[in-house]
Amino acid sequence: MINTDEKYMRQAIELAKVAQSQGEIPVGAVLVCNDEVVATGWNQSIQLHDPSAHAEMIAVRAAGDQVENYRMLDCTLYVTLEPCPMCAGLLVHSRIKRLVYGAADLKTGSAGSVFNLVANEKLNHQVAITSDILGAECSTMLSAFFKHRRAEKKALKQANKKLITE
């Protein structure tokens, strides 16, 4: 039997695939309150021309509209990639109770990998953290995306060089 964290992380992975199909970094988020999905999101920064349009931001904004409150007390956010500093701040300000993420972000992770903003005792709210839920699957998806993106850029660069030399 699949556990609850894996169930919702699988939903977040499906949303990450939507992001990837739109040319976005494949990150998906599912916000659950009282065992009910309240809102979802996937990265849309490129599509919306908005650097804040991360999966977490989109899900929490949608949840605020849904529950008519900016506080997400007793809610859990499931996200395929550890939140960045901006999204970590969002989790603290929205009073999310628990964060569950898949892959660690060794460059900007703010739930323990680089910083631990969500559990910083100097802040007025701390978020409980559960990490590495389906982490290998989330990590593999992200690695494959960036590998493909680098190959595309390399091919474009080589094509441009060829045009210049002709």
For each predicted feature, which ranges?
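Zinc-dependent deaminase
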Residues: M1-Q22, P83-M86, L90-E166
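Acidic helix/loop or adjacent segment enriched in Glu/Asp that either coordinates divalent metal
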Residues: I2-D5, M9, I46-A62
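Small-residue (primarily alanine) positions within well-ordered alpha-helices
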Residues: A12, A16-A19, A29, A39, ...
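Short, basic and Ser/Thr-rich N-terminal targeting/leader segments
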Residues: G23-V27, L73
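Short beta-strand scaffold segments in enzyme catalytic cores
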Residues: V27-D35
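Short secondary-structure boundary/capping segments
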Residues: A29, E68-N69, A119-E121
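Short beta->alpha transition motifs characteristic of CBS
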Residues: V38-S45
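Helix-adjacent hinge/juxtasegments
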Residues: A53, M57, R61-S94, R98
